[in-house]
Amino acid sequence: MRRGGPSVLGIVLAGGEGKRLMPLTADRAKPAVTFGGTYRLVDFVLSNLVNADILRICVLTQYKSHSLDRHITTTWRMSSLLGNYITPVPAQQRLGPRWYLGSADAILQSLNLVYDERPEYIAVFGADHVYRMDPRQMLGEHIESGAGVTVAGIRVPRAESSSFGVIAPGSDGQTVENFLEKPADPPGLPGDPECVFASMGNYVFTTKVLIEALQRDAEDGDSVHDMGGSILPALTDRGEARLYDFSANHVPGETTRDQGYWRDVGTLDAYYDAHMDLIAERPAFNLFNRSWPIYTHSGQLSPARFNAGGIASESIISAGCLIRGQVTRSVLSPGVVVDPGAVVQGSVLHDNVHVGRGAVVRGAVLDKNVEVPPGATIGVNPGRDADLYTVSKGGVIGLGKGQRVS
């Protein structure tokens, strides 16, 4: 941070494979997946850090990282005159000829970055969630408490706990009494037994505490070398962990509807549902907040165009789109073409998708460059769709990059 504040290094964990989000992650890392028409998932965490004046950030990458590396280097160019940077850091095998064994091992292998910067605190954040947050408020509570690590938590239904790391707070509601990685049946919260605190994957560490924890973990032959599965439980056992309640975080320009909004979009269903949150008249998450913007590279495209017969309602239509058919409750990325007589309903279309004359697309997520030929249908015949495409548990149809519809 600048302007006389504490020195903070941002580390963004962006090395996961994202298998649950197939087919969108077949050719790219999950943080590089398009979201909301023009953004990449990584843009949300980077925007939150930059808006909070955390301007020295390392993004640790590993699997299928070319698209992510290119996006970061071409979009997130900070002023080097002021010593600021956002840089992708691929696995460098500094500790031997091996890839990262887990998120904790990724940071361990990148400690040279910490030694170079010598920050007082380190903000370790995930790269693939949709939300707005002011990390300065979490940092302030961390410094005031004197804890070794502060973990951001959000209330979720207890029935969903198996998808998250779960934080069990102590009697004071602030110290962390237990940290459970994806438990099947954890106890509920006092006074709210049907909810638990899920870890958001965002942590603030006192630098010395993190380094020592990573070194101890590296010597543990039984460890999985993961932040949630290893480091957090170990620091909890040592009494050094504190909970930060995300509901207390406020950003400028937020509405009562999107305050506290956070989504893990790690599955096709969750990804689709988060897009549907964007398009209501009163959206659950409002992309149009100029007081706390989400930044990205907008490209050099002409404005969207609607020809005679082209209609769109309750939708996000990006630059470069040509709409000659009907689009409802959908999100279209740049360069999408919808031909006359075509119908797109409740769908997410990535860059340069072409929906041919008279075609129908319903309840689908189409990756970039997908071709839907004239008269073809997606989301009309469930049996046929299941034979040809990826279909999620919730019935969302997914087509991979460049796939042509039969």
Swiss-Prot record:
Involved pathway(s): Glycan biosynthesis; glycogen biosynthesis
InterPro entries in the record: ADP-Glc_PPase, ADP_Glu_pyroP_CS, GlgC_bac, GlmU/GlgC-like_hexapep, NTP_transferase_dom, Nucleotide-diphossugar_trans, Trimer_LpxA-like_sf
Catalytic activity annotation: alpha-D-glucose 1-phosphate + ATP + H(+) = ADP-alpha-D-glucose + diphosphate
Amino-acid positions noted as binding alpha-D-glucose 1-phosphate in the UniProt annotation, renumbered to this chain: 100, 165, 181-182, 199
GO biological process: glycogen biosynthetic process
KW Nucleotide-binding (keyword) present: yes
EC top class named in words: transferase
One GO molecular-function entry: ATP binding
EC numbers: 2.7.7.27
Superkingdom assignment: Bacteria
Keywords: ATP-binding, Carbohydrate metabolism, Glycogen biosynthesis, Glycogen metabolism, Nucleotide-binding, Nucleotidyltransferase, Transferase
Protein role: Involved in the biosynthesis of ADP-glucose, a building block required for the elongation reactions to produce glycogen. Catalyzes the reaction between ATP and alpha-D-glucose 1-phosphate (G1P) to produce pyrophosphate and ADP-Glc.
Family as reported in the entry's similarity comment: Belongs to the bacterial/plant glucose-1-phosphate adenylyltransferase family.
Subunit structure: Homotetramer.
Protein name: Glucose-1-phosphate adenylyltransferase
Organism of provenance: Streptomyces avermitilis (strain ATCC 31267 / DSM 46492 / JCM 5070 / NBRC 14893 / NCIMB 12804 / NRRL 8165 / MA-4680)
Gene transcribed to yield this protein: glgC
